[in-house]
A protein has these predicted regions:
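Short, ordered loop/turn segments at secondary-structure junctions
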Residues: 11-15, 25, 53, 87-89, ...
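Structural signal for hydrophobic packing residues in well-ordered secondary-structure cores
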Residues: 3-4, 26, 35-42, 60, ...
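Rossmann-fold NAD(P)-binding glycine/threonine-rich loop
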Residues: 136-151, 160-193
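A conserved regulatory-domain signal marking ACT and ACT-like small-molecule sensing domains
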Residues: 1-62
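Solvent-exposed alpha-helices and their adjacent loops that cap or buttress functional pockets
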Residues: 10-12, 40-43, 74-77, 124-126, ...
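N-terminal glycine-/serine-/threonine-rich beta1-alpha1-beta2 phosphate-ribose binding loop
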Residues: 47-53, 57-150
Length: 194
């Protein structure tokens, strides 16, 4: 479910424990996945990376800010904004970004960023239940989808570039999402031209 390959697995002689070996870089993600599955946390966490903070992205972040308490209370869903980026800078924080002042934080504490370096940061964080939300119109950002999805990051795209590119690319993205057990959502593309 989390896209982590198990190198070796063994059951103890008393049949009360299971041990498995994974690559060290997947340790945190594996622990979060196991805890989420076995101990049924009080709420589900979605870790969002939002790219593009213009009209669409800015309004999305404002809606999330206003709805976070209600989503937690009524749906048991915690939307944790772990990354925000514009065309020049990115702000990344595993523990979550305060949406009350994210624009100022991005300008003062954000690191210089390109679509490629942002993709590397997202994959390097290796967080369970990650969702990359593309609110740009950039073909360079859309070109990252396959790589992100191969890293088990779901993609939600208001950007019409990927879904309206070649049919082969569209099929690749849909197949990658299906194979990886993640989401590729792009319904907002339909309204982009209206």
């Amino acid at each position: 479910r989390a896209g982590i390959s198990v190198i070796a697995c063994a059951q103890g002689a008393s049949e009360t424990n299971i041990s498995f070996v994974i690559k060290h870089k997947y340790l945190r993600k594996a622990l979060n996945s196991i805890h989420d599955s076995f101990f049924l946390s009080e709420y589900k966490v979605l870790n969002l990376f939002v790219v593009g903070i213009g009209t669409v992205g800015g309004n999305l972040l404002e809606q999330i800010r206003l709805q976070q308490p209600k989503l937690m209370e009524q749906n048991g869903l915690k939307l944790n904004i772990v990354g925000i980026a514009n065309s020049r800078k990115a702000l990344i924080c595993r523990d979550g970004i305060n949406l009350d002042n994210y624009r100022e934080e991005l300008e003062t504490n954000g690191m210089d960023s390109t679509p490629e370096t942002l993709c590397e940061q997202v994959l390097k964080m290796n967080i369970f239940n990650s969702v990359f939300v593309d609110c740009t119109a950039s073909p360079d950002v859309a070109a990252l989808y396959a790589r992100l999805m191969n890293g088990n990051v779901s993609v939600v795209a208001a950007n019409k570039e990927a879904a309206s590119s070649s049919y082969e690319n569209y099929q690749l993205l849909k197949e990658t999402a299906r194979h990886r057990g993640i989401k590729f959502l792009f319904e907002t593309n339909v309204g982009a031209g209206l």
